[in-house]
A protein has these predicted regions:
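Conserved catalytic cysteine-centered active-site region
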Residues: 55-110, 152-156, 221-247, 328-355, ...
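Beta-strand segments within the central parallel beta-sheet cores of soluble alpha/beta enzyme folds
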Residues: 46-54, 80-85, 110-115, 174-181, ...
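N-terminal extracellular/periplasmic Venus flytrap/periplasmic-binding protein-like
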Residues: 11-12, 23-27, 31, 40, ...
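Flexible glycine-/small-residue-enriched beta->alpha junction loops
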Residues: 109-163
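Active-site pocket-lining segment
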Residues: 159-162, 195-198, 275-344
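Active-site-proximal alpha-helical scaffold in enzymes
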Residues: 86-116, 165-194, 254-261, 326, ...
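Conserved active-site "lid/cap" helical segment
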Residues: 1-61, 65-73, 77-80, 160-172, ...
């Protein structure tokens, strides 16, 4: 089996819903970040064997968004590309598939990650295929229907977070405090320019000229008092609010994986070695607890234990599920999401799995920590995890 290394990890800044990236398509974002990642790696477009990208809200994007991004980025058309939809796990699953292709010897260099513009998700009408003879036509929000709605229980993902809060006895106060800490850590990281190296600036044309978007815009100033004033967002008597949940966001994340021997032969700098992955499954109605299962399976697969991990990046879909995972694994919160998480930074669903790994890799490089783990929950009751190591 071939050893697989990371030779580049880049992302866009994360845009707020209907914010700076609202008119920048997933294709355009992906091309911009992919080109920057290639430049950072020292590879040429012709060195790439395959492109594998996660995307959830594919309606209206045209055929195979990964192939569109591949060709627009200058990667030759005799190479291949495909898109992956595993809801929030899409881009991490893309990374796993890329890793496996290299490990098994099918490819040597694979671009992977994910793209998502939730702001541009279209409305759908299932009434129009055969026409409407009279009366109103129903419109479906594809962002909610395809990205945020539990297909098994017919309710919003937020209900699953309330279910986890109830099952694990997590109070509203604990959730709000967790959310506040995420915001404070993210703001401190932005002020210290910790994300600068991982972010690809994107030029956006508007009526006033060209604006360079290069800083996460979703983090917001907040207090426990302001969080406490928010009403429950999903259940009338629930504890999950807009303030202790992740956002609806836009962004792209790209990672380039390479056969270790190939990287050495080309003289490429490596950020980390991929040690392995873990998957987990649970009941869809408490999907947020699944990272704890995925991480346990991941560590078993790579013959490590929790004490071997120096840093964790856990996607903060909701404060409730994040706290539950911390409790379930008995993790030290001081080594988890040290620069804030999705509650502050945002959650562009098809790109988030790669986003947390990009951030983890750069924090490991900055801090010198040797082993890291990134994990996230997946709508429908699944979880994904990856362990990486600096050598």
């Amino acid at each position: 089996m071939n050893e697989v290394v990371v030779v580049a990890a880049k992302r866009s800044a994360v845009g707020s819903f209907l914010g700076s990236l609202k008119n920048v398509g997933a294709r355009e974002m992906g091309v911009c970040v992919l080109k920057d990642a290639l430049n950072a790696s020292g590879l040429k477009p012709s060195d790439v064997d395959s492109v594998i990208l996660g995307n959830v809200l594919g309606a209206g994007l045209g055929q195979n968004i990964a192939r569109q991004i591949q060709l627009d980025a200058g990667i030759p058309n005799d190479k291949n590309a495909f898109s992956v939809n595993m809801v929030c796990g899409s881009s991490m699953k893309a990374i796993q598939l890329a890793h496996d292709a290299i490990m098994l010897g099918h490819d040597e260099v694979v671009v992977c990650g994910g793209v998502e513009n939730m702001s541009k998700a279209p409305y759908l009408s299932f009434d129009m295929r055969e026409g409407k003879r009279m009366g109103n036509a129903n419109m479906i929000d594809s962002m909610i229907h395809d990205g945020l709605w539990d297909a098994f229980n017919d309710y919003h993902m937020g209900i699953t977070a309330d279910n986890v809060a109830q099952a694990y006895h997590i109070s509203r106060e604990d959730q709000d405090n967790f959310a506040l800490q995420s915001q404070l850590k993210a703001r401190a990281a932005i002020n210290a320019k910790k994300f600068q190296e991982e972010i690809t600036p994107i030029e956006i044309a508007n009526k006033k000229g060209v604006v360079v978007f290069k800083e996460d815009e979703y983090p917001r100033d907040t207090t426990l008092e302001s969080l406490a004033k928010l009403k429950p967002a999903f259940k009338k008597d629930g504890s999950v609010t807009a303030g202790n949940s992740s956002g609806i966001n836009d962004g792209a994340s790209i990672i380039i994986l390479c056969n270790a021997k190939k990287a050495q032969a080309l003289g490429l700098k490596t950020m980390a070695t991929i040690r392995g992955f873990g998957l987990g499954g649970c009941s869809p109605d408490i999907m947020g607890i699944c990272p704890s299962i995925a991480i346990k399976n991941n560590l078993k697969n790579v013959k490590m234990n929790l004490n071997d991990i120096n840093l964790f990046e856990l996607n903060e879909a909701f404060a409730a599920q994040s706290i539950a995972v911390l409790k379930e694994l008995e993790l030290n919160p001081n080594i988890v999401n040290v620069n804030g998480g999705a509650i502050a930074i945002g959650h562009p669903i098809g790109a988030s799995g790669a986003r947390i790994l990009v951030t983890l890799l750069h924090e490991m490089k900055r801090s010198g920590h040797g082993v890291g783990c990134a994990s996230l929950c997946v709508g429908g009751g699944q979880g994904l995890s990856v362990v990486v190591e600096q050598k």
